[in-house]
Regions:
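Intrinsically disordered, low-complexity segments enriched in polar/charged residues with Gly/Pro
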Residues: 44-46, 111-112, 119-122, 129, ...
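Cytosol-facing regions at membranes
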Residues: 2-45, 63-65, 69, 230
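Conserved beta-hairpin
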Residues: 68, 121-163
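Short, solvent-exposed coil/turn segments at beta-strand boundaries
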Residues: 59-66, 137-139, 195-196
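Cytosol-/stroma-facing membrane-proximal "stalk/adaptor" domains immediately downstream
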Residues: 206-230
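Short, solvent-exposed secondary-structure boundary motifs
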Residues: 33-52, 116-127
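Non-transmembrane, membrane-adjacent beta-strand/coil modules in membrane-associated proteins
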Residues: 3-6, 26-39, 49-54, 58, ...
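Alpha-helical transmembrane spans
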Residues: 2-6, 15, 63-134, 199
Length: 230
C-alpha cells in the first residue's frame, strides 16, 4: 500500500511542476474596452475544453463567403483513432476467431470492445470536427453544423446560427486545459451578438494563427475584434 501512495504523490508532484512551467496569463480587464456590451458579456470560456494544436483554418471561398475548414493535422488526428481501432478489432478477431466462435466470455470480447470505442471516438471527433463553419454574405448569416439555414423551416432550430447584422463583435479568450499528464492553453474565437449572447466559432491551441484568422474575419464582417489574450 505505501508504494501506491508514493506513486500517487509523485504523479501529483509531477503535475504541479508541469503546471508551474506553463506561463500564467494576466487576467483581462473588460473595462479597457470602452463599450457597454463588453462590460456585460462573459469573459470565461464559452466552450470548455479545446485542443493543443490548430484544428481549423479560415478559407476564402469567394469575396462574400468565408469558411473555417479542418486542418490536415486535425483530420489525421481523427483518423488515427478510427484506423487504430479498426486494425485492433480486425487483428484480434482474426487471430482469435476459433475461440470467439466456440466460447463466449467477457475476456474474449474486451479487446474488440475497446477497439470499437476507439473507432467510435474517432468517428465522433470527425463528425463534429469537420462540420461546416460558414460566414455567408449572400445569405447574410453565420452557421456552424451539419444543417444549414436552407435545410430547416425555422433558423431558431439551429443552435449555432446568427444573422450577420446581429454580430456585434468578435472575442478571443484563452483557457488553461489540464489533463492527467499534460496541460496547455486553448484559445477560443467567439461571436458576440447584439443581445450579449456568445457563440463559439473555433477553439484550438495556435494563438498566432487564430489571431490572423480573427483579424481577417473582423475585416470581412466589419466588426471589432476584442482580444483578451495578454
Amino acid at each position: 500500500m505505501p508504494p501506491i501512495e508514493q506513486g500517487s504523490s509523485f504523479a501529483s508532484s509531477l503535475k504541479e511542476r508541469l503546471l508551474a512551467l506553463i506561463p500564467v496569463r494576466k487576467r483581462f480587464d473588460p473595462s479597457t474596452i470602452s463599450d457597454p456590451i463588453a462590460q456585460q458579456i462573459a469573459w470565461t470560456p464559452a466552450k470548455p475544453g479545446g485542443a493543443s494544436f490548430r484544428t481549423h483554418k479560415l478559407v476564402e471561398i469567394d469575396a462574400n463567403r468565408l469558411e473555417f475548414k479542418p486542418t490536415v493535422g486535425a483530420r489525421l488526428f481523427y483518423l488515427v483513432f478510427i484506423v487504430a481501432g479498426t486494425i485492433a478489432v480486425v487483428a484480434f478477431a482474426t487471430k482469435n476467431m476459433a475461440s470467439l466462435l466456440t466460447s463466449f466470455s467477457f475476456s474474449n470480447i474486451l479487446p474488440i470492445f475497446f477497439g470499437f470505442i476507439f473507432v467510435a471516438a474517432g468517428g465522433f471527433m470527425w463528425y463534429f470536427g469537420t462540420a461546416p463553419i460558414v460566414f455567408d454574405k449572400y445569405k447574410e448569416c453565420f452557421w456552424k453544423g451539419r444543417k444549414g439555414p436552407d435545410e430547416v423551416a425555422n433558423t431558431n432550430e439551429l443552435k449555432n446560427f446568427a444573422s450577420l447584422p446581429d454580430i456585434y463583435a468578435l472575442q478571443i479568450i484563452s483557457e488553461l486545459c489540464t489533463a492527467k499528464d499534460s496541460s496547455y492553453y486553448s484559445y477560443e474565437l467567439n461571436l458576440v451578438l447584439t443581445n450579449g449572447r456568445r457563440i463559439n466559432v473555433v477553439d484550438h491551441g495556435n494563438i498566432k494563427c487564430l489571431r490572423v484568422d480573427a483579424q481577417t474575419l473582423s475585416q470581412f464582417l466589419g466588426k471589432p475584434l476584442w482580444d483578451a489574450v495578454l
